[in-house]
Regions:
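Conserved P-loop
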Residues: 33-106
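Pre-Walker A adenine-sensing motif
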Residues: 4-31
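Hydrophobic helix-cap positions at the C-terminus of alpha-helices
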Residues: 27, 56-57, 162, 166
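Short, flexible, glycine/charge-rich loop motifs used to bind or transfer phosphoryl groups or to couple energy/partner
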Residues: 24-27, 55, 128-130
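Substrate-engagement module of ASCE P-loop NTPases
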Residues: 152-168
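Conserved RecA-like ASCE ATPase "motif II neighborhood" in helicase/translocase motors
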Residues: 102-156
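A conditional alpha-helix N-cap/helix-loop micro-motif detector
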Residues: 13-17, 46, 152-156
Length: 168
């Protein structure tokens, strides 16, 4: 069912000149725990991966966790989700909603919760939300190379802690 929905998404919403999301072809491969997509700017991965994963989340009930480096970037993910729905029009944007909690933001479409947004500094607190997080097993951490002062301390360990809270 996953491959069928992914193929449908790619055919209808993914222009040929952009990143063709080959990593998603292997998303259900039990031999692979995580994927890295390292490409130049402008190939569409920062729009097309989130878009396709939100689409699949809605249609297949596979939740997505968007992780950002700093709390202030959570708003950018909210804006990206709205932009995706307005641009591709695969769902009525007026049915999009957000619910804030202390540690994450829930993204919903209609009656479904399809994703959450959190930041790396919530890694320790998120372990107390593992009952919720387990429903959002696909983690998207789309970050660019930053100036040395923009990185947070223990960045890798914090991402690993979030992964462990989800992968129970």
């Amino acid at each position: 069912k996953f491959k069928k929905e992914l193929k449908k998404y790619k055919k209808k919403y993914l222009p040929e000149k952009y990143n063709q999301l080959e990593l998603l072809d292997e998303l259900c491969n039990p031999e692979i725990d995580f994927y890295l997509s390292i490409t130049n700017r402008g190939d569409g991965k920062s729009f097309n991966y989130p878009s396709s994963l939100l689409y699949l989340s809605y249609h297949l009930d596979i939740g997505v966790t968007f992780v950002v480096r700093h709390f202030t970037l959570q708003q950018r993910i909210r804006e990206l989700v709205e932009e995706i729905l307005v641009t591709l029009n695969w769902y009525d944007v007026s049915q999009l909603w957000f619910r804030n909690t202390d540690d994450y933001i829930v993204i919903g479409l209609g009656e479904k919760e399809i994703a959450i947004i959190t930041d790396l500094n919530n890694a320790s607190d998120l372990k107390y939300s593992s009952q919720v997080l387990k429903d959002f097993p696909i983690i998207v951490y789309d970050e660019f190379l930053a100036l040395s002062g923009d990185y947070i301390s223990n960045e890798y360990e914090k991402l690993q802690m979030i992964y462990r809270s989800i992968d129970r």
